[in-house]
UniProtKB/Swiss-Prot annotation:
One of its GO terms (molecular function) is actin filament binding. Residues 463-474, 677-697 have a biased composition (Polar residues). Keywords: Membrane, Signal, Transmembrane, Transmembrane helix. The keyword Membrane applies. Residues 396-849 form the FH2 domain. It comes from the Eukaryota. One of its GO terms (biological process) is actin nucleation. The chain crosses the membrane at residues 81-101. Residues 186-196 have a biased composition (Basic and acidic residues). It comes from Oryza sativa subsp. japonica. InterPro entries: FH2_Formin, FH2_Formin_sf, Formin-like_plant. This is Formin-like protein 16.
């Protein structure tokens, strides 16, 4: 409700100005009046005078007129001076009266607006009257001036004025929530109430703005904004109450120093600060009344309780901007409060989570703290002052006799009451999570364990079971006729099948092969003994009560005669083709491996080199002069090292064979070298220099050339013996017994078909049995042939090896496979050695002859020593004749070696 408009002093000011200004003029027109100015100084102007020229000093009275009459010009000037002085005096007096009336009206306006004048009206009015106004407000404050915590500052001013005698004035019965005021409500109210068509003079407004001091920094949140009011009076349910957080400071702060945040900037008198209240003893005071608009009278008592424990500090300084106040330390959390103090509350000790209310009193339960705790009054505080929940969460409230006994959970308990700091368990409440005790009793109760063991013990003689006293539902129990573990395994197999029971029965009755091999293999694992079949067939109860495994087996036995024999027959038919193909492949591998060992001449040369080297090393001993040796000695060649340890007997033998093969290849294929030599002889015409040049490289270079040519040939031996390596991996027992196994299974299937006569299953398998019988007969003949070839090959390399019962029948292939691997590694080592020896050397200069060294090396050869030639001609000839070979990998083939050598020759 807007305050009643006060009478404006404007008409009175105009009337007074007219009377004071016109009266002297009217009196001065009829007579010559001597004007005397008052000796006192005029009061200071609130605004600068419009005329800047100095006026005559009013302090000195004018002289009395002389006896002689003045001139006309002197009279006119005296009259003008008198008029001007009178006008200025009138304006000064009128202005002073105007400002007095305006100040009085403003003070009255602010007082009627809700007591706001007690703050800044006392500061300004005190400068004029020298005392604080004591005028009572006619109606409650509008709520447009709040402190930094969102509380009504005018309410606290009124509370201070009441003193220690009582609880203060009662708040109004109903208080409308504050609406968002305009940006400058004070200036708007002044213009509306005073009915001023024009704003006050700019100099006076500017002065007031300069003298005032903003209470909050510019750009910060306006406490009178709509967002602040909504959060103050309508807090959200999920967040901590704004009253419980912000009012803890407001109720504990002295009323003389509220941090007021007004809607508009409030002027304050800088020379006369607000009087600080006298220090009051920290005596208990009655509970504080609730500000207008609050819901529960118990909340202020619970919030201001933490401020009583500490003594009242000295009076604080005049109010400063709210942003500059440092945050005080937080109070002890949830400390039980003593009786509320009397008198105004002391300064705020802390800013943080509010403590819980005192445990005594008829007030409703306090608001929950930030942790979200709920429950009754807290127990006596521990040493640290932190309250703990009265009971552990999850503990049932019933008696021990009514609770079911559960399995124990072994853990170490923690005494949260003995800690002096907050813990995570403080945030756990009894109502945040509800435990379903029925489920936990069913899962972990001892009665549930006993119920699981009773069905096996309660079987009767007929295979059924009783459910009396078990506490189970009315659903029929499953009957287990087999061993429980076997029944469980069969149930797992049945659940993994991808076909239904009817399809399985149809395939077993008609001999269809639509069932996959995987399904047939799983069905073959369901085979049970005769005793178990008799137990299932003797069951005369309801089949629907049987367990899944027993039910399936009983249906299978009743619908299909000899079901597991039929499953084995169908499985044999499904696997027959793959097993026969694998057997044929193994026989073919053994046959080709035997042929490779009989026809490859390079392997013979390796054996010859080993034999000669062994005889040379064993000369003069009983092991010397041997004609043959057991092939098991090939594995020991790498163990015989040279005297200096730089090489082994294996490397020596392989290097000799490589050099021999390279020399043979050089003689047979190096036609370009011979052609170039013959052309050189014909061109030189018998010149000894030319004939010496045609002799080619030295002995060492030729040996290296032979090694480079022979390495691809010897290294490709592993590729030529590929089937020998495969034959070493063949399972000889499988090859020998596979035909017999297939024959026995085929004979059992044939006998089964004869038993069934002419039913669908027999008709479906009769054609397969006939074709398989013929194929197995042919396979047996081929098997005998291949095994005989393997024996002859073994005897070919080692006489009497087949008669050794402890020897492996395929031992020859295994030894050769291992030796070929050693040969490949030796070839790689030789190639690496050649690459290390072949290092680029700078060509000799023309001034230093290098021919004698080359001639000396050439003389060591069997060929006659050629005549010496100039170094330039020898080097050019070597570059033209010397072939180049690429670096070979670890495993190289003969075809690649041939292509490399031919490309080098070209």
């Amino acid at each position: 409700m807007a305050p009643a408009p006060s009478p404006t002093p404007l008409p009175l000011f105009l009337l007074l100005l007219l009377l004071v200004g016109v009266a002297p003029l009217a009196a001065a027109q009829g007579q010559n009046i001597q004007t005397r100015f008052p000796s006192t100084r005029t009061p200071a102007f609130a605004t600068p005078p419009p005329i800047t020229s100095p006026s005559p000093s009013p302090g000195t009275p004018t002289a009395t007129p002389s006896s002689s009459p003045p001139s006309s010009s002197g009279k006119r000037s005296d009259i003008a001076v008198a008029v001007v002085s009178t006008a200025l005096s009138s304006f000064a007096v009128s202005g002073l009266a105007f400002f007095l009336f305006l100040r009085h009206g403003k003070k009255r306006e602010l007082t009627e607006a809700g007591g706001a004048g007690q703050h800044y009206g006392g500061a300004q009015g005190g400068a004029l009257t020298g005392k604080r106004p004591e005028r009572e407000p006619k109606r409650p404050a509008r709520g447009n001036m709040v402190d930094e915590n969102g509380l009504d500052a005018i309410y606290w001013r009124e509370f201070e004025k009441e003193g220690d005698g009582g609880r203060g004035r009662k708040p109004p019965a109903s208080r409308r929530p504050p609406q968002p005021p305009p940006p400058r409500p004070y200036r708007a109210e002044r213009r509306q109430d005073a009915h001023e068509s024009s704003a006050p003079s700019p100099p006076r407004s500017r002065k007031n703005r300069i003298d005032q001091e903003p209470l909050i920094p510019r750009g910060s949140l306006d406490s009178a904004s709509a967002e602040f009011d909504e959060s103050l009076y309508a807090p959200s349910a999920g967040s901590t109450s704004s009253f419980s957080v912000a009012a803890a400071e407001a109720y504990a702060r002295p009323p003389s120093t509220p941090a007021i945040t007004a809607v508009s900037s409030v002027p304050r008198s800088s020379p006369s600060p607000a009087p600080a209240p006298a220090a009051r003893p920290a005596s208990p005071s009655p509970s504080l009344p609730l500000p207008p608009g609050r819901e529960s009278p118990s909340r202020p008592q619970s919030i201001a309780a933490a401020a009583v424990a500490s003594p009242a500090p000295p009076p604080p300084p005049p109010p400063k901007p709210a942003a500059a106040a440092p945050p005080p330390p937080p109070p002890p959390k949830a400390a039980p409060p003593p009786p509320p103090p009397k008198g105004p509350p002391p300064p705020p000790p802390a800013k943080g989570p509010p403590p819980p209310p005192p445990p005594k009193g008829p007030s409703p339960p306090p608001p929950p703290p930030p942790g979200g705790k709920k429950g009754g009054p807290p127990p006596p505080p521990p040493k640290g002052g932190a309250s703990r929940p009265p009971a552990a969460p999850g503990v049932p409230t019933g008696s021990a006799d009514q609770q079911a006994k559960l399995k124990p959970l072994h853990w170490d308990k923690v005494n949260v009451a003995a800690t002096d700091h907050s813990m995570v368990w403080d945030n756990i409440t009894g109502g945040s999570f509800n435990l379903d005790e029925g489920i936990i009793e069913a899962l972990f109760g001892t009665a549930a364990v006993n119920r699981k063991t009773k069905p096996a013990d309660s079987k009767d003689a007929s295979g059924g079971s009783t459910s009396a006293g078990l506490g189970r539902s009315n659903s029929p129990e499953q009957i287990f006729l087999l061993e429980p573990r076997k029944s469980h395994n069969i149930s797992i197999i049945l659940r993994s099948l991808t076909v239904g029971r009817e399809e399985i029965i149809d395939a077993l009755l008609n001999g269809h092969t639509e069932l996959s091999t995987e399904v047939l293999e799983k069905l073959s694992r369901l085979n049970i003994s005769k005793e178990e079949e008799n137990t299932l067939l003797k069951f005369s109860g309801n089949p629907d009560r049987l367990a899944p495994a027993e039910f399936f087996l009983l249906r299978l036995l009743l619908d299909v005669p000899s079901p597991f024999a039929r499953v084995n027959a169908l499985l044999f038919k499904a696997n027959y083709a793959a097993e026969v193909a694998q057997l044929k492949q193994s026989l073919r591998t053994l046959e080709m491996a035997s042929q490779e060992l009989r026809t490859k001449g390079l392997f013979f040369k390796l054996l010859e080199a080993v034999l000669k080297a062994g005889n040379r090393m064993n000369a003069g001993t009983a092991r010397g002069n041997a004609q043959a040796f057991n092939l098991t000695a090939l594995r020991k060649l790498s163990d015989v090292k040279s005297t200096d340890g730089s090489t082994t007997l294996l490397h020596f033998v392989i290097e000799e064979v490589v050099r021999s093969e390279g020399k043979r290849l050089a003689i047979n294929r190096n036609y370009s070298l011979r052609r170039s030599g013959s052309l050189a002889k014909s061109t030189d015409g018998g010149n000894p220099a030319a004939s010496s040049t045609s002799q080619g490289p030295s002995r060492e270079e030729r040996q290296n050339e032979y090694l480079n040519l022979g390495l691809p040939i010897v290294g490709g031996l592993s590729t030529e013996f590929a089937n020998v390596k495969k034959a070493a991996l063949v399972d000889y027992d499988t090859v020998v017994n596979e035909c017999a196994i297939l024959g026995n299974r085929l004979a059992g299937t044939k006998k089964l078909l004869e038993t069934y006569g002419d039913d669908g299953f027999a008709r479906g398998l009769r054609g397969f049995v006939k074709a398989a019988e013929q194929e197995l007969n042919e396979l047996k003949g081929n098997q005998e042939k291949v095994l005989e070839l393997v024996q002859r090959t073994t005897e070919y390399y080692h006489t009497g090896a087949t008669k050794d019962k402890n020897a492996h029948p395929l031992q020859l292939f295994i030894i050769v496979r291992d030796f070929l691997g050693m040969v490949d590694q030796a070839c790689v080592d030789i190639k690496r050695k050649l690459q290390q020896q072949k290092k680029p050397t700078p060509p000799p200069s023309s001034s230093q002859p290098a021919a004698p060294a080359a001639t000396t090396k050439g003389a060591a050869d069997d060929a006659p020593a050629p005549a010496q030639k100039p170094p330039e001609e020898v080097d050019s000839k070597r570059k033209r004749v010397m072939p180049r070979f690429p670096n070979l990998p670890a495993h190289f083939m003969k075809d690649n070696a041939d292509s490399d050598s031919s490309s080098d020759e070209e």
